[in-house]
Each structure stands twice: as C-alpha cells, then as structure tokens.
C-alpha cells in the first residue's frame, strides 16, 4: 500500500520541458527527462484569470515548467508555471519591482518604492505604444518645468 501511495505522489507533481504549444487551444505538451522523454498529452496552462478578466500567457517551447497531474493517471494534467534555473536566471533581484521581460529584450518594470513605471524597447528598431479608445492624461511639464507637450499632443523640441 505504501509503495502505491509513493508511486501516485511521485507522479502528481512533475518538472518537464515544453515540447510544443498549441496557440489556438491554449495548451502545451511537455517532455519529461526522468521518463525517457515521454511526452504528455495536451495540457491546459494555469492563468491568473479566465472569466471576465482574461490573462493570456503560454510557455515557449523548450521552457522548463512545473506540472500537476490528477491522481487518476497522466492523461489529465495542468502546467502550473515556469521555473527559473541555472540556465534561465532571474531577470532582476529587487523586492520592490514587478518586471516583465520579453524575448526581444523589451521590458516593463514598475518600482513600487519609487513609483516609477519604465517601458524600455531594447529592440534595435525601437517600439510603438498603441492606446486605443482611451482618454490619455499626462503631466504637461518636465522635471525642468518646461512644457513637454503642445495641446495637439506633439512632442516639443
């Protein structure tokens, strides 16, 4: 009986590498090195919201993920999230920051201590910010006290 319980528990939580992603269904397949590269069925990916508020995130192929399987077997499981590792290190180490870094180097960073939101397009061609269907409010002076924007919202030079 104890061996059966150990076997079930050992198969409930597993670490693997994403082998493929179905961007239409929002699922991914995961290969498990400890099982001779056995590949899972399509697994749902845990997200922060899926009802009224919706959060879209899918892991990349070759990303290390943590998976949870139902105790009825390995036919139904879920990807709980990604893991940092020796190869994939933390992008920052600051308890006051929320940080999102994208594959092209672009990042969004909020520092709750300094109340600073930073958006940095590290891509050689720069980037675009698109705001649709919104009224934008902004401070009309720079730190130097000079006008930053004209009423037409064109940057002053």
Q: Where would I find each of the regions flagged by the language model?
A:
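Conserved hydrophobic positions within beta-strands
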Residues: 17-20, 79
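Non-cytosolic beta-sheet module surface loops
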Residues: 20-22, 69-71
């Amino acid at each position: 009986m104890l061996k059966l319980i150990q076997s079930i528990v050992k198969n409930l939580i597993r670490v693997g590498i994403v082998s493929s992603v179905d961007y239409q269904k929002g699922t991914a397949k995961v290969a498990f090195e400890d099982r001779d590269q056995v590949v899972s069925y399509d697994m749902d990916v845990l997200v922060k919201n899926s009802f009224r508020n919706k959060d879209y995130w899918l892991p990349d192929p070759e990303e290390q993920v943590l998976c949870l399987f139902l105790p009825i077997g390995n036919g139904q499981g879920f990807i709980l999230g990604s893991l940092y590792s020796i190869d994939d290190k933390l992008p920052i180490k600051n308890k006051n920051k929320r940080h999102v870094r994208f594959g092209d180097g672009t990042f969004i960073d909020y520092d709750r201590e300094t109340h600073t939101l930073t958006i940095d397009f590290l891509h050689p061609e720069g980037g675009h910010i698109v705001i649709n269907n919104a009224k934008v409010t902004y401070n009309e002076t720079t730190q130097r006290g000079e006008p930053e924007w004209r009423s037409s919202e064109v940057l002053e030079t």
